[in-house]
């Protein structure tokens, strides 16, 4: 189904909107919901698109239009058969008597034989979906007029040509007859018997009129009291089996028009001649063969119940009916191309009541591609097929919970969600997650959410998830966890860590992942994730990425809401929780120090003869003072002996060991640099004075240098600086 992007979007949206309406009604617990309305809406959507494409005037849309029309027919078939199969058929047992009319016996058979009734339903469906050409303009208004005028026919008796071989029918009469009978045949296949009768009357074809009047079995409300309230007068004809054989004998008359013979074959429950059958399609061929099954089984039942007199059995007719499976196989062999169409394969499975197995086969096809067993197949190459099968699985599970394997339904829905993601139809995705179990729902939703960055799209996702009553909190938690898991390998360095001042896409992906918790107002979880994010960034030298996160989010507000949420949820006060807030505060101080460091670097790079030296010196002194204070306090309390047994102690100590030496050495370098640029020697002395801080046994900062492997580098730096002071 090749469609423009507009059409594709509309159809995806139409199907998802239908499911959304169902869920809304279900969640609101309104009046009893008819799940079959979903199928009816699907049929309507497919039918409307078929009509739109057909009316578009674009020849390239012809195939797409036919495919959508075929899909509309499919949903119609699903509706008809599933309604019947799931109906409460606890009907009163009909008691029959030998004197009842044969029509009542037929009614009893259809009531008891569910398989036969379903064949009748399929035939009704085929009739309703049979295309009948427009009424031909040259349908004759009288019989044999040209032959009588030319003298080739000596009698106006309509059956005279059959009884007298010497008559010569005019060629034009034969042509008009062919047009008429072909039209009548199409009307009969479409179930338009009344219309066919009217056409026969208008064309003066009394024989066809009389024959069509014998279609119905005899019913008499006088003796058939069981259905007396359904009829006022008798209907149908007696000795219907005799009528059937008489009509059948006419179908064997080689001298008749092929379509006239085909009419008689169909009415008698036989297969039409090859001259007509060669022009049949999958649907009409199926119709003809199902008609044969129906008529054969009905007469067999009547024979078993002694409702057919021996005087009616003037000709032998087939008494063995094919099975529906055999019929479908035969039709498939005659129409291989049509029968291989994926939608017709689904139609056949609906008729055979084997939809769950077909759904499972579709899943196997998906897995074959994933495993690499197949490069492609219909379910992958034809997205419309995935859409149909997915929605079919959803409908079946709604109507008959458990009728579709949970794993099959899940794989179809999650694959379809991936298709929607490729189409950029994010708003349509959450509704499908509602039909998954909670575990699969979390995985499917988190898979999608973890890839979203646009603020408006993210906001809409949360709104929709909440509106559909999905487990929003767990979905957002799983999304954040998924992003942490996905990026873990990127933050497992094998070489020496260096402080970097760039922000890459992976950093942003992790930031977006944590922000789901903030946007979802899950502040307790958000604080825990901010801790995890900060540690991951800092342990890998991604200090600028942490700065980016803190610039994007109001950390103070998050911490306040964190405290309020704990109170509201009656979460007991925990020493570790207080430690988390303190840890975040420490990271804020670090980021502030990094900003000052970068600002000083910028000031130095812009230094010129026009620079305000006093202001610059003041700025350096402020930077030096703040950095010195940060060096002395950064994570000191959280890595004190009081927390030595804490599970987080080693992590925090490692972060401190990475950044404290970095800050101290960079401050040292900047003071030395400033001393040279500004010609102020005392800055060198200030830099060298840091050695006492490093060697101080109270602060034990030298241990941080040892731990980070920076001690030798620092001592070399001090030695070089010392030569400058001499």
Curated annotation (Swiss-Prot):
It is a peripheral membrane protein. One of its GO terms (cellular component) is nuclear membrane. Disulfide bonds: none annotated. It is found in: Nucleus, Nuclear pore complex; Nucleus membrane. Its main location: nucleus. Signal peptide: none annotated. Residues 563-583 form a coiled coil. The keyword Protein transport applies. One of its GO terms (molecular function) is identical protein binding. Pfam families: Nup84_Nup100. Keywords: Coiled coil, Membrane, mRNA transport, Nuclear pore complex, Nucleus, Protein transport, Translocation, Transport. It comes from the Eukaryota. GO terms for biological process: double-strand break repair; mRNA export from nucleus; mRNA export from nucleus in response to heat stress; nuclear pore localization; nucleocytoplasmic transport; positive regulation of DNA-templated transcription; positive regulation of transcription by RNA polymerase II; post-transcriptional tethering of RNA polymerase II gene DNA at nuclear periphery. Present with 8580 molecules/cell in log phase SD medium. Functions as a component of the nuclear pore complex (NPC). NPC components, collectively referred to as nucleoporins (NUPs), can play the role of both NPC structural components and of docking or interaction partners for transiently associated nuclear transport factors. NUP84 is involved in nuclear poly(A)+ RNA export, in NPC assembly and distribution, as well as in nuclear envelope organization. Belongs to the Nup84/Nup107 nucleoporin family. Component of the nuclear pore complex (NPC). NPC constitutes the exclusive means of nucleocytoplasmic transport. NPCs allow the passive diffusion of ions and small molecules and the active, nuclear transport receptor-mediated bidirectional transport of macromolecules such as proteins, RNAs, ribonucleoparticles (RNPs), and ribosomal subunits across the nuclear envelope. Due to its 8-fold rotational symmetry, all subunits are present with 8 copies or multiples thereof. This is Nucleoporin NUP84.
């Amino acid at each position: 189904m090749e469609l423009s992007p507009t059409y594709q979007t509309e159809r995806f949206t139409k199907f998802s909107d239908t499911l959304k309406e169902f869920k809304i009604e279900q969640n609101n617990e309104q009046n009893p919901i008819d799940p079959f309305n979903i199928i009816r809406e699907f049929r309507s959507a497919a039918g409307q698109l078929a009509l739109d494409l057909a009316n578009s005037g674009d020849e390239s849309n012809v195939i797409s239009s036919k495919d959508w029309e075929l899909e509309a027919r499919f949903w119609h078939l699903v509706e008809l058969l599933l309604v019947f199969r799931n109906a409460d058929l606890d009907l009163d047992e009909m008691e029959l008597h030998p004197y009842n009319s044969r029509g009542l016996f037929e009614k009893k058979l259809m009531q008891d034989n569910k398989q036969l009734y379903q064949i009748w339903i399929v035939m009704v469906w085929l009739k309703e979906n049979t295309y009948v050409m427009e009424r031909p303009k040259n349908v004759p208004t009288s019989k044999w007029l040209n032959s009588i005028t030319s003298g080739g026919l000596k009698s106006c008796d309509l059956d005279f040509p059959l009884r007298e071989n010497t008559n010569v029918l005019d060629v034009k009469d034969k042509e008009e007859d062919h047009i008429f009978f072909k039209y009548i045949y199409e009307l009969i296949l479409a179930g338009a018997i009344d219309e066919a009768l009217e056409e026969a009357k208008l064309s003066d074809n009394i024989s066809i009129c009389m024959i069509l009047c014998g279609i119905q079995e005899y019913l008499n409300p006088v003796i058939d009291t069981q259905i007396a309230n359904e009829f006022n007068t008798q209907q149908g004809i007696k000795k219907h089996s005799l009528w059937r054989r008489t009509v059948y004998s006419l179908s064997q008359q080689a001298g008749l028009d092929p379509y006239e013979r085909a009419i008689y074959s169909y009415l008698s429950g036989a297969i039409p001649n090859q001259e007509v059958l060669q022009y049949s399609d999958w649907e009409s061929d199926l119709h003809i063969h199902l008609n044969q099954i129906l008529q054969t089984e009905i007469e067999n039942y009547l024979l078993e119940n002694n409702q057919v007199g021996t005087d009616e059995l003037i000709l032998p007719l087939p008494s063995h009916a094919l099975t529906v499976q055999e019929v479908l196989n035969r039709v498939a062999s005659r129409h291989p191309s049509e029968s291989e169409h994926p939608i017709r394969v689904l139609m056949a499975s609906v008729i055979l009541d084997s939809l769950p197995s077909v759904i499972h086969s579709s899943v196997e096809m998906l897995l074959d591609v994933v495993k690499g067993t197949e490069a492609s197949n219909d379910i992958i190459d034809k997205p419309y097929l995935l859409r149909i099968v997915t929605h079919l699985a959803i409908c079946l599970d709604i109507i008959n919970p458990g009728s579709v394997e949970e794993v099959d339904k899940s794989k179809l829905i999650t694959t379809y969600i991936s298709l929607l993601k490729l189409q950029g139809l994010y708003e349509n995705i959450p509704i499908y997650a509602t039909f998954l179990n909670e575990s699969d729902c979390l995985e499917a939703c988190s898979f999608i959410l973890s890839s979203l960055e646009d603020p408006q799209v993210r906001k809409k996702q949360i709104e929709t998830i909440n509106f559909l009553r999905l487990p929003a909190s767990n979905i957002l938690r799983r999304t954040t966890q998924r992003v942490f898991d996905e990026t873990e390998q990127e933050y497992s360095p094998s070489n020496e860590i260096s402080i970097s001042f760039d922000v890459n896409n992976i950093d942003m992906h992790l930031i977006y992942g944590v922000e789901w918790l903030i946007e979802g107002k899950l502040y307790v979880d958000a604080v825990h994730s901010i801790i995890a994010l900060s540690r991951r960034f800092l342990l890998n030298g991604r200090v600028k990425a942490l700065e980016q996160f803190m610039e994007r989010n109001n950390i103070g507000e998050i911490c306040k809401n964190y405290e309020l949420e704990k109170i509201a949820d009656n979460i007991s006060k925990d020493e570790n929780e207080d430690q988390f807030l303190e840890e975040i505060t420490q990271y804020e101080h670090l980021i502030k120090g990094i900003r000052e460091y970068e600002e000083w670097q910028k000031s130095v790079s812009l230094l010129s003869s026009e620079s305000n030296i006093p202001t610059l010196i003041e700025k350096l002194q402020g930077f030096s003072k703040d950095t010195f204070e940060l060096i002395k306090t950064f994570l000191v309390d959280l890595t004190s002996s009081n927390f030595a047994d804490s599970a987080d102690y080693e992590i925090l100590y490692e972060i401190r060991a990475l950044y404290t030496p970095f800050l101290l050495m960079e401050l040292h370098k900047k003071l030395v640099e400033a001393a040279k640029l500004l010609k102020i020697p005392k800055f060198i002395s200030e830099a060298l004075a840091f050695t006492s801080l490093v060697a101080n046994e109270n602060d034990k900062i030298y241990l941080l240098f040892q731990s980070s492997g920076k001690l030798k580098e620092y001592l070399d730096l001090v030695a070089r600086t010392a030569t400058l002071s001499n």
